[in-house]
Amino acid sequence: MKVALIAPQMWVHESYCRSSDHLFRKSGANTGNFAFVHALWSHLSPHVEIFPWEASPEMMRERCDIIVMACANQLGPHSNLEQLAITFERAKLPILAIGLGAQARELGATVELTAGTRRWLDVVAAHAPANAPNIGVRGEFSRQQVEHNGQRDRAMVTGCPSNLINPDPSLANRIDERHRLGRVERVAVPAGLHHWVKLAKIERVLVDIVEQTSGLYIAQSEIDMIRMARADWDNMDDATFHSLRNYVRPGLSDDDFRLWCKRHATCFIDAASWMESMRTFDFVAGPRFHGVMLAMQAGTPGGVIAHDSRTLEMCETMIIPVRMHDDMPASFAASDLPSLFEFEAAAYDRRRSELANRYVDMLTAAGIAPSVGLLGLTRSESAAPAPVALQRTPELAAAS
């Protein structure tokens, strides 16, 4: 069965001679997206082809048998997926949505959808390839929001597929061994944003640690953070430059801040090189979930500083070390990171296997053969029998 994977690019070709704007656009406006696109590609290969959101539905139907959409936090009033709903209706193919999350100020709040996103949700649910859930969500809160919006039996908690990149079933033990050593000589920080005022003091402490440990400050989003990481100063106005400097390193002169960025700031153009780099670090901590997740997939301990419901939900679902930003101490050192972010190896290992089982069940129910690496993360004794998949979904009337 050939899969049409609706997703940003897995990597940016010839990024060295491309603009920061090109890199940012191809990443889907956040380089953290490389993590789950890499995961889905590896789990679905070799019978998979990536299509952008604006792809022709006729082309997808001609070349593929099923659609798998790499989702993010699309459940919320900030999102309007009307055009994608129309594309999916016209493609007339079975659909899986993987990694869907809800965005709210706090867990427990009710998320209201735009009419376009509600239509998209109805279209995805109606194109289920089997008599089984076809929407993999990030956590229980997101599952409840799918149910609240009329799709009671369509969603299943699978977490984020980036949690299953590394095919080593003993990954938890590898992370735990390094975590227990407690020796933190080099730290990487997946950076926040210069307008996240509530995180400013914490970010400066993290930046101090980066400097003290010859570490890295990794930009993921927004475009000006990417420009900063690539020394793309000519495409940045003075006001933005000074806003960045005042957030990251307010005590430095303009020239010294540029030099600091050359030494410590970076961004990545694919998940593989990102994980390879993280192997050489002792700890990774910051407000970006996927920046921490990629480090953990490389066997490096990490912790997420959460500041919203979507980040907290993912961490709690997958047993990723996490602290809310307002629970962080005012001052801390690199050596404090392992105790601030305790790693529950046995719990992480069990949950990782449980989520892998659910994810594999969803794929096999749809008639998709999971990769050998993904299958190796499951525990066959707890896997449910796979329902029979349908080859095609009949044409769906436009959902209102």
Task: Report the location of each language-model feature.
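Active-site anion-handling motifs in enzyme catalytic cores
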Residues: 1-400
